[in-house]
Amino acid sequence: MTFYNCRQFSVLASLGYLLMCGFALADTTAETETDGLLPLYLLEVPDSVDDILIADTSAATMHRFVRSDAGIMHEDQRYMSIGQAGAGKEKAWDRKTPLGVYFITESLDTSKLHDKYGAAAFPLDYPNAWDRFNKRTGYGIWLHGVDHNNPQRPPLDTDGCLSLPNEELLRLVDSLQPLVTPVIVARQLDWASPADLDALRLEFRVALDMWRQSLEQGDLVTYLSLYADDFIYRDMSRDDWSSYKLGVFEARQLAGVALDDVLLVADPEVKNLYLSRFTQVLMTDSGPVTTTKRLYWRRSDDRQWRIVSEDSG
């Protein structure tokens, strides 16, 4: 049996499947050279996030990256099954796995679930605000194990969930934090240089800080200028949002606004779409008001950043 170095990246889903089924394979190494590169999606990871999962659906591989004093490091990888119809979910029961940035919401008691979910199960927050913006439907997308009685699953085998071998998922259980651990689901794992990521991060930070300052200063004109014309918040259009925020700004004076635990990521599917997720602390006369927010940003070719959707949680 050949065991692969966890820092070599699988490019053939069939190899992962055969390994899981116990077949011996000849020595094989990936052609992709990633030395010195980082995942394209990870612009800024806060201290509160220790682990990031990135699912490479084209290679049937789940990668785990960890944050360390030395930066973002590739920790390990494992075989994964996705939806029977592949990736790119658009509607309920299309048996596709959604592409995007998601978060684990909770850990379920699998003793109360069907055997097909295996040793552990973690629901993801599909559909998120960006999915709703695009009118995607469906629900019940989980990261889970496999049936103990039928553990050998091909790469395309679920109803849309991400499925890992039980022993592999159990190795991750202690690392998966509800409402903290990001799960980035991509068609393929793309890379960028640290210098390119840092330049983009600084640009993103400028836009985010402009949003924070305008909120803190009660500058409604600047605040609304950061929202795209096609912005949607739940059932609100940009015009509805503007009217709503006018009332909010007039009614509330803030002594300060802090953004903590800032996570900045690039969407794996849509070019120039980015997510900022953070803990927002509003300093009010009656004390601090703390919420977790997500802003989905679109970056134009001339480097203008505009918010297209937002949500809490």
Describe the predicted segments one by one:
Residues 288-313:
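Short beta-strand edge/turn micro-motifs at domain boundaries
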Residues 10-22:
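Bacterial N-terminal signal peptides
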Residues 94-99, 108-209:
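Exported/periplasmic cell-wall-interacting domains
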Residues 24-26, 30:
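Boundary at the C-terminal end of the N-terminal hydrophobic targeting segment
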Residues 217-230, 234:
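Short, well-ordered alpha-helical segments enriched in acidic and aromatic residues
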Residues 211, 223-224, 241, 297:
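Hydrophobic pocket/interface hotspot
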Residues 33-140, 151:
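Gly/Pro-biased beta-strand-loop elements
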Residues 96, 246-294:
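Surface-exposed, charged secondary-structure patches
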